[in-house]
Amino acid sequence: MQAGFFHTPYNLPTRTARQMFDWSLKLAQVCDEAGFADFMIGEHSTLAWENIPCPEIIIGAAAPLTKNIRFAPMAHLLPYHNPASLAIQVGWLSQILEGRYFLGVAPGGHHTDAILHGFEGIGPLQEQMFEALELMEKVWARKPFMEKGKFFQAGFPGPDTMPEYDVEIADNSPWGGREALEIAVTGLTKNSSSLKWAGERNYSPISFFGGHEVMRSHYDTWAAAMQSKGFTPDTSRFRVTREIFIADTDAEARKRAKASGMAKTWEHYLFPIYKKFNLFPGIIADAGLDIDPSQIDMDFLADHVWLCGSPETVKGKIENMIERSGGCGQIIVNSHDNIDNPEPYFESLQRLAQEVLPNVKTS
C-alpha cells in the first residue's frame, strides 16, 4: 500500500506566504525521502486556513529538490482558469517533472472563491468545469480547431491558420502523451456525483474519509460508473485521506497529536466544515456511540477520527478500515501546520511510509 500526502495546506491564518512556501518545499522533501508516492497540493484563493492559491509554483520549485515523488494540484478549479492556458501549463509542468505529475480537477466548493471570480455562488461551476476540461482535452490533442463555448473559448493553430508564416508549434502536451496523464477527482459526500463523473471518464477517485459507509459508497459509486462505460475498476487506484499521527507508544502519539497543528486545525477550522457537510454521523456510527455531533471533543477525535498510536496500533486501525470499507491502494495523510515543532510530525510521516504501510495486510 502506498503513502500519499495532501497539502491542503491547513495552515494557521497568521502564516506569511513565504513561510508557507518554505514549509511546503520542506514537506515535499521529507515525504520524498520517506518514500511517499504522491504529494498533492490544494488551490484556494480566499481561504486563510488553506492559503496556497498557486499550487503549480510549489510543484515547479519542488521538482529539482525531489527525486521520486509525484506531484499534483488537488485540484485546479477549472471554472477559474482559461482552459487553453491551463492545458499548456499542465502539459509543460508534466514535462519539467518528466512524468512525476498528475492532475486533479474540481469545480470549486467555496463561495468566497466563487465570489472572488465574479460568481454569486457555486451552482453553475460544475457545468463550467465540464466545458473547460473538454477544451483542455482538445488542446492536448494538438489538432487544429477554434471553438467558442457557453463559457470559454479556445483553439489550436494549424498549417492553414497563418499561411504567410512558417511557425513551428511548440509541443506542450503532457509528458508521454495524453494517455499517460492521470486525472484524479475528490469525493466528499455519500454516493458522490463527482466520483460517478470520474468513473465514467476513467479518472481516479480520492475519498475524503467520512466514515466506513461513506468510504465504501465512494468506491462503489466510482466502480459502477467505470463498468457502465466499459472500464475495469481496481482498488489499487482508490485513495483515501486520513488524519495520522504515529509515535513509539499510543500514549505518546496521542499526546503529540493533541499538541500538534492537527489539533489546532480541528478545533478552529475543521469542526465547522465537518458539521456543514454532515460528515460526523458516519464517523459516530463507526464508533458505535449514540451521541450528537456537538458532543465530539479532542478525545473522540483521537480515538475515532485520527489514526493515532504506535506503528502497530495504526497498522491495526488501517486493516480494520480496509476490512470494513473494501480496501484502497493509497492512504493519504492530510497536511497540518507543524512549522513551530516539525520533528515529531516528520517522524510520524517517516514511520507511516517505512514501518506501517509496508506491513499492512490488504486482504
From Swiss-Prot:
FMN binds at M74, T186, G187, L188, T189, K190, N191, S192, S193, S194. SUPFAM superfamilies: Bacterial luciferase-like (SSF51679). It comes from the Bacteria. GO terms for biological process: (+)-camphor catabolic process. GO terms for cellular component: cytosol. Keywords: Flavoprotein, FMN, Monooxygenase, Oxidoreductase, Plasmid. Its EC number is 1.14.14.108. It catalyses: (1R,4R)-bornane-2,5-dione + FMNH2 + O2 = (1R,4R)-5-oxo-1,2-campholide + FMN + H2O + H(+). Pathway: Terpene metabolism; (R)-camphor degradation. Optimum pH is 8.0. The keyword GTP-binding does not apply. InterPro entries: Bact_Lucif_Oxidored, Luciferase-like_dom, Luciferase-like_sf. Involved in the degradation and assimilation of (+)-camphor, which allows P.putida strain NCIMB 10007 to grow on this enantiomer of camphor as the sole carbon source. Catalyzes the FMNH(2)-dependent lactonization of 2,5-diketocamphane via a Baeyer-Villiger oxidation to produce the unstable lactone 5-oxo-1,2-campholide with (R,R) configuration, that presumably undergoes spontaneous hydrolysis to form 2-oxo-Delta(3)-4,5,5-trimethylcyclopentenylacetate. Is also able to convert (+)-camphor and norcamphor to the corresponding lactone in vitro. Homodimer. Likely forms a loose transient complex with a P.putida flavin reductase that provides the required FMNH(2) to the enzyme. Belongs to the bacterial luciferase oxidoreductase family. This is 2,5-diketocamphane 1,2-monooxygenase 2. It comes from Pseudomonas putida (Arthrobacter siderocapsulatus). The lineage of its organism: Bacteria, Pseudomonadati, Pseudomonadota, Gammaproteobacteria, Pseudomonadales. The gene is camE25-2.
